[in-house]
Amino acid sequence: MQIIRTIEELRQILAPARRAGKRIGFVPTMGYLHKGHLELVHRSRAENDVTVVSIFVNPLQFGANEDLDKYPRDLERDAALLHRADVDYLFAPAVSDMYPQPMQTVVDVPTLGNQMEGEARPGHFAGVATVVNKLFNIVGADAAYFGEKDFQQLVIIRRMVEDMAIPVRVVGVETVREEDGLACSSRNVYLSPEQRAAAIIVPKALDEAERLYRSGVDDPDALEAAIRTFIATEPLATPEVVALRDPETLERLTAVQGRPVLVALFVRLGTTRLLDNRVIAHVAQEQAA
């Protein structure tokens, strides 16, 4: 595996592969890799000739009171994991290379990005869309891989790619979980032992949402309220966002029965926010399958 630090070097190295018609897969990350990231790598390697992983903690997607400086970083550890996973190229640019001067161009998908997590983190998804767009321009990949844990992000990136006619296939990969069901996340390292034990309320809340859906609850407001109440049974957990949405458009639902439903959770434990979600398939669809 080769570690590349600059945009120009990466473009030069990938040019021969592109001329030879090789498929390039791309996994953008902010580092401090876990099993979920490695699953994205495995998918890319299985489907492409060359795999590029980027590690870049993007300052544009952090708010003024968020954890940019504290975000976990360990490039040596991450590089060792990627080497063992047979990644071809690790792109680890400095902020000064990605943003040599203050950005005046911003890519925003406001209808999708200003709701749900975007309500709690104003400007976050504009920062995400801007850096992902720039990385797509740099790498020129045929396919890019994103975890479904960050479902809103995945929907936003797909829409950006469609709107901007970017020639890349966006692949969503199923959420990888710990043995107790908690979604793998770089931010899990922030949790104290007590908070880590309490965090299991998040996947359990998704189970409860599915149980209520299967029982015939049709009013989205009632279902959201029930999920909030369920999460609040854990004293250390605060539900910041509980949303039932259309999984393709993120539109609010007036009724949940008779259609697939995205249940999206944004739960705070101490200073740590955990994201999780589940798309609950319509019963009739499952029976017909």
Curated annotation (Swiss-Prot):
ATP binds at residues 30-37, 147-150, 176, 184-187. Pfam families: Pantoate_ligase. GO terms for cellular component: cytosol. Pathway: Cofactor biosynthesis; (R)-pantothenate biosynthesis; (R)-pantothenate from (R)-pantoate and beta-alanine: step 1/1. The active site is at H37 (proton donor). Keywords: ATP-binding, Cytoplasm, Ligase, Nucleotide-binding, Pantothenate biosynthesis. GO terms for molecular function: ATP binding; pantoate-beta-alanine ligase activity. CDD domains: PanC. Beta-alanine binds at Q61. It comes from the Bacteria. GO terms for biological process: pantothenate biosynthetic process. It is found in: Cytoplasm. Homodimer. Belongs to the pantothenate synthetase family. This is Pantothenate synthetase. It comes from Brucella anthropi (strain ATCC 49188 / DSM 6882 / CCUG 24695 / JCM 21032 / LMG 3331 / NBRC 15819 / NCTC 12168 / Alc 37) (Ochrobactrum anthropi).
